[in-house]
Each structure stands twice: as structure tokens, then as C-alpha cells.
Amino acid sequence: MAQGLEVALTDLQSSRNNVRHHTEEITVDHLLVRRGQAFNLTLYFRNRSFQPGLDNIIFVVETGPLPDLALGTRAVFSLARHHSPSPWIAWLETNGATSTEVSLCAPPTAAVGRYLLKIHIDSFQGSVTAYQLGEFILLFNPWCPEDAVYLDSEPQRQEYVMNDYGFIYQGSKNWIRPCPWNYGQFEDKIIDICLKLLDKSLHFQTDPATDCALRGSPVYVSRVVCAMINSNDDNGVLNGNWSENYTDGANPAEWTGSVAILKQWNATGCQPVRYGQCWVFAAVMCTVMRCLGIPTRVITNFDSGHDTDGNLIIDEYYDNTGRILGNKKKDTIWNFHVWNECWMARKDLPPAYGGWQVLDATPQEMSNGVYCCGPASVRAIKEGEVDLNYDTPFVFSMVNADCMSWLVQGGKEQKLHQDTSSVGNFISTKSIQSDERDDITENYKYEEGSLQERQVFLKALQKLKARSFHGSQRGAELQPSRPTSLSQDSPRSLHTPSLRPSDVVQVSLKFKLLDPPNMGQDICFVLLALNMSSQFKDLKVNLSAQSLLHDGSPLSPFWQDTAFITLSPKEAKTYPCKISYSQYSQYLSTDKLIRISALGEEKSSPEKILVNKIITLSYPSITINVLGAAVVNQPLSIQVIFSNPLSEQVEDCVLTVEGSGLFKKQQKVFLGVLKPQHQASIILETVPFKSGQRQIQANMRSNKFKDIKGYRNVYVDFAL
């Protein structure tokens, strides 16, 4: 009588499988595979060979704490002689004297996560022997055409899934600067932290069985991750802070990568890391999504609207000195705002609305009771389809709201100006396999001022008006800020709006910088006044300057001036202005943004003219030099050159340096004091442990500035 077949050991072929599944950057020691793609394993038997006619091998895969056949978190399937279509499948590849090689494949809709793999062997007379073969992790598969995250471009897959560094664009529309970032999605322990993040979500804590079953949907997973990146509803990864007081944590500007943040969250028992702002939330989310296999990129929107009441109007209030006031409505225009786009099919929406989807992890407004935003179809945003899930009205307003300026005087409000094109400029992301910037504004809206753009805006406005009677996706009634804001005379309607006297501009004001605004130097600019009428104009112009946070919140003004300008018909004049370093140095925010404003009025007319300009102060970047050839497992010297751009000494200088595949962990060097206008350098030693294109990111902070940054790309060769 034949003996029952006994398994001696199992080779999961982790190294070979992981290379084929594009997960070898994470590890080759443990099995990480992607759904919809076969992987191989070898069964070694103790007593004899596998006999297909005699032995029946049944595989069992389970994920989550409560595996369930009905929910799809448990699957049972037999070894077949040939590849045949079914949800989970296993087929015979080769059969030897003491071993058998088998291929397995998860369906392209399977839940992602950590799986347990077992087999049952039924050899004869009903005897069944069970074995636990091991664990594996299943990820989304952008290489599989049947997967909802399939991306039909290898360069895009390399950029949006495999690239572990990039740039996040900051500054202002007139001074866009790239901030280098280490995503590090393949670094040690990051995949485990990403899976823990899913398990710490409110969804899992409330109903773990259903949550695990839904992890096959990138729409669902992206919403869960989005909510978990911030800590407003749970023990998410990051605490947000826009107060300029970071004494009990890190200034958001100091971060240069996601790895340190995620590892700190994990090491402290999932206590939120202090602190983040929009680009940090988006960068960490990019790391998690790329690690899970969902193509993701980081997007920056300059002059980004935050419309709190859903009427597509951002109201700004000024006093008679031109100073911007704190907004009682909490509407703001962020100097820049950063979110993510994730690539996925949207079977929950009409056709053509798949592809890039906006997800915003910055906690601004609630969505279905939690702080997350999206996924919102970029195509739906462009077409004004604000009734499509999720949170499309909010994202539409970020890129296409109107801005209304009001003068507050004597308890009354006077309309100064209505701008239909100031919100949503230079929407940017890193180019594919390049360090250049891509402008993708046309993905979000038609050209400003075009007929299509006006039609889309009106369509969105009308949809919001209809929704205001039934509530919104965000659970709040949509209350227009002015009774006419949803009428046919609304901003950018197809009908010509009736103009108030303050809209009839006969005199224009404009600011012009005379020199590039550098940190530590005086700011020199002129106010240009132009009389476009055939009459004399006597102007009184109040000028002011105040620092801004990047979310648009104003700080106290630190400079004021008054100009009296007489203009002949058609005449232009300039009024020179200077703000010295000593005047602004004590008032700067971390973002180094200064808003200069001018409010002009005629002596003989109630007409008022408002103009403002945001100045971003620049400063020298860090220079990084690689000394010699970079080779895996061989010592490498790196020179970091930094300087103090100020005419005063700076204290408490700390340099941080990191780079995936180059440094095992973030390096911190305490530099102490830097003398005025002084340049210095240090040499760091490291041993690269991964080959290919890599990037070094560096940041220097001090008591005067927090984010002097630099980067250097490095190609690491294999060791001979």
C-alpha cells in the first residue's frame, strides 16, 4: 500500500519571485507578490514523489483575523495539472522524484495584505495531512491589465511605483522651488508599517472582517490610507500644525523624507508624529501608496482655494491700510497646497472618469464623518461634475474658485474686486524619469477666460445650488456668501454681470520688484500707478506688508507707508519702496512669505483700487559633492557645503542627510554656530547598499531658518 505523501520543506522562491513581481527592492528574504501574476514554489517530499492520480493537493490562503470564504478573505483551491481560469489557482509546473514545482496566482481583485499559505494533502483512503507552508504579502499590480490600478506605460510605472525619491514643489507661482524628498517605500520595515497602518484604521477596528475583504478595492484602500495619514480621527501618522510653534516636535519644513516619520510612528506605539503640513501629509501618503502598489504622484497647486461653504467664492477682507484681515468665514487662499493623485479604475463612476484621482490627506474638511478627501476624479473636476464621488466640489474649489475682495470699514463691507483667475495656478508634479517640473494645469481646468471654462464653472455652480437643498458630500448645507453668488449674474456666468462702481477701473496699480528678494537683504520695489482716463486723478495709497503662512493665514503687519500721487490723463508714475532686513527679519514665518498690499482711493470718488503681491525670499541651497565612484558595499565619501546667507551669526545649526539605498538611517550633524556670511563644509562617510539611481537629500536648520535644502543624484554601480 502506498504511503501518504509527506512534505519535508517548502521553498517559496522568494528571491526569484520578488524579482519577477518588482518587489526585490523591498526584500528578497520574504515572499512579496502582486495579484493577478503567477508565483512559483517548490514542495520537497520526505518519502516519495507526488503522484497526480493518487494524491490530491489542496491549497488554502487566508488573510485577516477572521478569514471567510464568503467574504473572499479565505480561498480553498486544488492543484490542477494545467492553468485554468478561476479566482485563486494553482497548477503543476514540474514533478520530480522528491519535489514538485507549483505555480499559484491570486485573482487581480484579491484583497491586498498579509496571507497565510497552507496545504492539505489527501493521499489515499480519505487520510488528510495539513501543513502550514508560510506567509506572503500580496500587493496591487500596476503591471496586470486586469488589476484596477493597471498603468499601461513602463516609464510611468517606474516613476509612480518604483521611484523612491522625488520633488515636492513649494514657494509661490512666481518663485517655484523643488523640495527634494526621500519617499523610501522600499526601505527596511516600511512594508510592515504600511500594513500596520491599515490595521490601525477606524474601519479595521470597527469591523476587521469587512475591512480586510474590501482591501481589494484601491478606492477603499486609498480612502483608508488618506484618513490614517492625519491623526484627527485616530492614531494616524501625523499631527498637523500651522501655528509656528513647534517646540514639542519638528518644524514641518525640516523633514526631508517619509521613512523617519513612519518609523517614528511605528516605534512609539503608533503615536502621531509632530508635526506635518500639507506637503508632509502628501509625501507620506505617496510612500504608503507606492509601497502597496498603487501608482501615485505628488501634486502642488499654487494659489489654492479653501472654500469652507461650498459656493466657489473665496472671500478676503482688508482694512483701509490694505492689510489683509483674518477671515471670519475661514475661507483662505493657500500660497501653495499639496495633495496626491493615485491611478485607478473607477467602476463606481460613469465611464471615462477613471485614471488619476485626487486624494488629499491634509485634514481640512470632513468626508463621511472622517478627515479625508477623495478619491476625486481629475476628469470630473475638469468637467465640473461635482456630484461624483468623492469630495469633488471641495477639490474643484481648490483649483477653480473665484476670489472676492472686501473692504471692511466702520462695520460695513464694500466690494473691492472680483478675480476669476487667481485660484489654481501652475499645478505641478515631477516629470517622468526626470528632475524637471511638469505643469498639469490643463488636466484640471480649461484655459482661464475661455468659453469652455465659463461653461464648466456655471455647470458646477448650478449642481452645487441643486445640492444645497439636499446637503452635500461633506454633510453641510451650502450657504452662498452673497445672495447673488448662485444667480445668473454669478462669477463667470455666460451672461454679462452688472458691474458695481468699484469694478469700473480707471486707475491701475501694480507692484514691481527691482531686485530678486534674497533672505538677509533689503526688499526694493516700486508701485506703478497708471491713469487710464482722460481726467486728472489725485490718489491716496496706503501700503502695508505682513508675513503669511503658506495656508494664507496673515500675521501682524510690520511695515506701512502712505503715498500721495497726482496723475495727469494717461500718465504713469512710480513710487519707490524699500523694506529693510531689520524691518522684516523678526516677523518672518517659516515659509518666508511677505505679502505687500496697496489700497488706493481717489479724493473725489468712492472708487477703491486694491493690489497685492506675494514675495518669497530666496536663500542659497546646500551643495553636495560625491567624492569618487559609488559602488555597492564599498565606502563612499560625500561632501556637504552650506553657508549662512545673513549678516548676523546663526545658532543651533543642525544638518540632516539621508538617501534610500545610501544611508541605513537619517544622519544628523550638530554644527553649532555659523558666522555671518560664512561658508563651511563637512565630509560624511557611508556604504551604499543598493545599486541604481539614488538621491541624497540634505537640510540645514538654525534659529533663523529651518529649511535650507539641497540634493544630489548618485548612480551606484554593482560591486565587481
UniProtKB/Swiss-Prot annotation:
EC annotation from Swiss-Prot or TrEMBL: 2.3.2.13
Inducing or repressing factors: By 12-O-tetradecanoylphorbol-13-acetate (TPA) and calcium in NHEK cells.
Biased composition (Polar residues): 481-496
Keyword Ion transport: no
Predominant location category: cytoplasm
Keywords, comma-separated and alphabetical: Acetylation, Acyltransferase, Calcium, Cytoplasm, Disease variant, Metal-binding, Transferase
GO BP: epidermis development; protein modification process
Reactions it catalyzes: L-glutaminyl-[protein] + L-lysyl-[protein] = [protein]-L-lysyl-N(6)-5-L-glutamyl-[protein] + NH4(+)
UniProt-listed SMART domains: TGc
Keyword Cytoplasm among UniProt keywords: yes
Gene Ontology cellular-component annotations: cytoplasm; plasma membrane
Cofactor: Ca(2+)
Ligand binding (Ca(2+)): N400, D402, E448, E453
Subcellular location: Cytoplasm
Record: active site: C278, H337, D360
Tissue expression per record: Expressed in foreskin keratinocytes.
Enzyme class: transferase
GO MF terms, alphabetically ordered: metal ion binding; protein-glutamine gamma-glutamyltransferase activity
Pfam families: Transglut_C (PF00927), Transglut_core (PF01841), Transglut_N (PF00868)
Function: Catalyzes the cross-linking of proteins and the conjugation of polyamines to proteins. Contributes to the formation of the cornified cell envelope of keratinocytes.
PANTHER family named in the record: PROTEIN-GLUTAMINE GAMMA-GLUTAMYLTRANSFERASE, PROTEIN-GLUTAMINE GAMMA-GLUTAMYLTRANSFERASE 5
Disease: Peeling skin syndrome 2: A non-inflammatory and localized form of peeling skin syndrome, a genodermatosis characterized by the continuous shedding of the outer layers of the epidermis. In PSS2 patients, skin peeling is painless and strictly limited to the dorsa of the hands and feet. It is accompanied by painless erythema and spontaneous non-scarring healing. Ultrastructural and histological analysis shows a level of blistering high in the epidermis at the stratum granulosum-stratum corneum junction.
Name of the protein this chain belongs to: Protein-glutamine gamma-glutamyltransferase 5
Organism (species): Homo sapiens (Human)
Gene: TGM5
